[in-house]
Design a protein with these regions (language model features):
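Substrate-binding pocket helix/loop in short-chain dehydrogenase/reductase
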Residues: 96-97, 101-109, 191, 202
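Residue(s) in the substrate-gating loop at a strand-loop-helix junction
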Residues: 140
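Conserved glycine-rich cofactor-binding loop
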Residues: 12-13
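Short, small/polar-rich loop/turn modules that mediate ligand/substrate recognition or access, typified
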Residues: 172, 177, 232-234, 240
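Alpha-helical segment proximal to the catalytic Tyr-Lys
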Residues: 125, 169-173, 230
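Active-site helix of classical SDR
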Residues: 120, 156, 164
């Protein structure tokens, strides 16, 4: 198939940027979703284009269903049909469950789980109608195993895994695959900015003895987006250096 458009939600963050680069290297026109009037947008686009990547911005608050629809419509009209969707948008609002504010529960579920519905709902039917598509949902090791102090985040990321399996069954005969990636600790700029002793303590829990590289997640996305991965669907691929082997 000829490469068309790949949409990456939360595409201008550390992990999102790596995913965008990996897909662009494979010849996709990559649309990086960001919030409307996102201050770093122009600088991010300029940097990516200077590095030779064919990237665009798709503005929408992914917690807003109507905004997602408008974004998808604009992308399809101005850039092309969306053949690959990577649902990567996510936030954290950590805290003990008994002390967790309802607003922090709602914010994480809305951004991390509802957004997957909001964007995918506008894209998946067209993929199925065309007989081709790739949906890649970014979950987390903590969605697989749970994590102390992250009841909201773990619930949202676990929800992504169930949604992935259900959608995969619905569209498997339509030439569309739906898979999830569950990263462990990845060396994004945000992680690398924490205190060295804290980072070292995290690394000590990982059998591989290191953090994952953002480009390792990006390259896995590129593989799942390819024709080579056409028989993989409904899968959760753990990429965590052996941190969790369930």
């Amino acid at each position: 198939m000829s490469k068309n458009v790949a949409l990456v939600t939360g595409g201008m963050g550390g992990l999102g940027t790596a995913i965008c680069k990996s897909l662009a290297k494979e010849g996709y026109k990559v649309v990086a979703n960001c919030l409307p009037d996102f201050p770093p947008k122009d600088e991010w686009l300029a940097t990516m284009k200077a590095e030779g990547f064919d990237v665009y911005a798709g503005e929408a608050d992914v917690t807003d269903y109507e905004q997602c629809g408008a974004m998808v419509k604009k992308i399809e009209a101005e850039i092309g049909q969306i053949d690959v969707l990577v649902n990567n948008a996510g936030i954290t609002r950590d805290g003990m469950f008994r002390k967790m504010e309802k607003a922090n529960w709602d914010a994480v579920l809305s951004t991390n789980l509802d957004s997957v519905f909001n964007v995918t709902h506008y894209i998946l039917p067209a993929m199925a109608e065309r007989g081709y598509g790739r949906v890649i949902n970014i979950s987390s090791v903590n969605g697989v195993k749970g994590q102390f102090g992250q009841a909201n985040y773990s619930a949202a990321k676990a929800g992504i895994l169930g949604l992935t399996k259900a959608l995969a069954q619905e569209v498997a005969k339509k030439g569309v695959t739906v898979n999830a990636i569950a990263p462990g600790y990845i060396g994004t700029d945000m992680v690398m900015a924490i205190k060295e002793e804290v980072r070292d303590a995290i690394i000590a829990t990982v059998p591989a003895g290191r953090l994952g590289k953002p480009e390792e997640i990006g390259d896995l996305c590129a593989y799942l987006a390819s024709d080579k991965a056409g028989y993989i669907t409904g899968a959760t691929i753990n990429i965590n250096g052996g941190l969790h082997m369930g």
